């Protein structure tokens, strides 16, 4: 009993020590603090946000998203029965006997619900990867942090974590600079061409090879090709557009006009959503609170609403 108490005291003491400014100093040796080159960066707020005193919540959040995605993905791939003809379409769940008469297909309501939940969880996988690239899943355990990031991005679409990490910090170091920011448009800020260039910046033949291998493995385990196309291709593609639209296009979109294609949209010009905390979460795991993300790049996604309150930006009147 005394040994357990001593260990708890020691653990609390180490966490308290780890929550000191030393954590941010260690973070700054591995990552990059934002530029303070403009009053719009509000340098007085630089130290207003303090990172979590423990890595426990960040790790728990990551494991919860991974575990929930895995359960829903396996259900979608192996248990959903997609209709193969118009005769098999039915909106609501039916009895087993009726389902057999309809070819054994799942109801459209069931299919839609699983697709919506899975797409949202795909978004969560990428947001967790994004946190890993910022070291914010586990600020004090870099190897565990990067391992979780690697797992999430592999489950998402087999992207190369190291490549994503490098390019994402190019985005933070050259935010809104045409030709330097891989997330920014290439001279045409239109939604479709920007999304196309954004996606092409991160995709590779090696990634497609791994996706093909993964699809073959799933088929060998009994997954129907139609399920793979819907739940392993369409869902993450829709998720990618959601991430792009709310986390890149809207926050960094230049002001309309003849010079829109050449405007520099430095990080402190990023926009922040006025959505409530709940809607911000449902939209994109708070990725729409983008000024705050660039102001405090060491803040995990689940603390961005707190960061918005610190900044006072984008707050709806009820929260002001």
UniProtKB/Swiss-Prot annotation:
Keywords: Carotenoid biosynthesis, Oxidoreductase. It comes from the Eukaryota. It is an enzyme of class 1 (oxidoreductase). Pathway: Carotenoid biosynthesis; astaxanthin biosynthesis. The keyword Metal-binding does not apply. GO terms for molecular function: oxidoreductase activity, acting on paired donors, with oxidation of a pair of donors resulting in the reduction of molecular oxygen to two molecules of water. InterPro entries: FA_desaturase_dom, Fatty_acid_desaturase. Its EC number is 1.14.99.63. Pfam families: FA_desaturase. CDD domains: CrtW_beta-carotene-ketolase. One of its GO terms (biological process) is carotenoid biosynthetic process. Converts beta-carotene to canthaxanthin via echinenone. This is Beta-carotene ketolase. It comes from Haematococcus lacustris. The lineage of its organism: Eukaryota, Viridiplantae, Chlorophyta, core chlorophytes, Chlorophyceae.
